[in-house]
Structure formats: structure tokens, C-alpha cells
Amino acid sequence: MAKSATIITFLFAALVLFAAFEAPTMVEAQKLCEKPSGTWSGVCGNSNACKNQCINLEGAKHGSCNYVFPAHKCICYVPC
């Protein structure tokens, strides 16, 4: 019993050391530019609906309702 506990402890320690030295992969962030939605009409009050419309209809990466004088508008975020 003591031998199996020692083996399990050793394997756990080896796993922790391996995970600690594993280098995370860095990916260069893609810059996004703001663009007013071309398909949204009216005041934007639902950021989730705006996001879905930007992604599905305009091919954007993201979308949200932002205040642009004089009202909230749906803004899509596209690669620059």
C-alpha cells in the first residue's frame, strides 16, 4: 500500500512540474476597428442582438450598442 501511494505521489509531482514548465502559446492579437452597422435600424438597446447581427449579417468579429451622439447605435468591430 505504501509503495502505490509513493508512486501516485511521484506521478502527481511530475505532472505538476510538467504543467508548471509548459510555455503558453502567445497569439498576436488582431486589431479591430469600429464601424457603424449597415444593417441595424433604429436605436440600439440590446447589445446581444447587435452582436449577433454584426457577426451573422456583416461578418464582424463582435458588436455592441455604443452611445454615438445623439443616440445609442449598433457598432460592429471588424479587422482593420
Curated annotation (Swiss-Prot):
Residues 1-29 form the signal peptide. Transmembrane segments: none annotated. It comes from the Eukaryota. SUPFAM superfamilies: Scorpion toxin-like. The modification Pyrrolidone carboxylic acid is found at residue 30. Its main location: secreted. Keywords: Antimicrobial, Disulfide bond, Fungicide, Plant defense, Pyrrolidone carboxylic acid, Secreted, Signal. GO terms for biological process: defense response; defense response to fungus; killing of cells of another organism. Disulfide bonds join 33-80, 44-65, 50-74, 54-76. GO terms for cellular component: extracellular region. It is found in: Secreted. Belongs to the DEFL family. Confers broad-spectrum resistance to pathogens. This is Defensin-like protein 17. It comes from Arabidopsis thaliana.
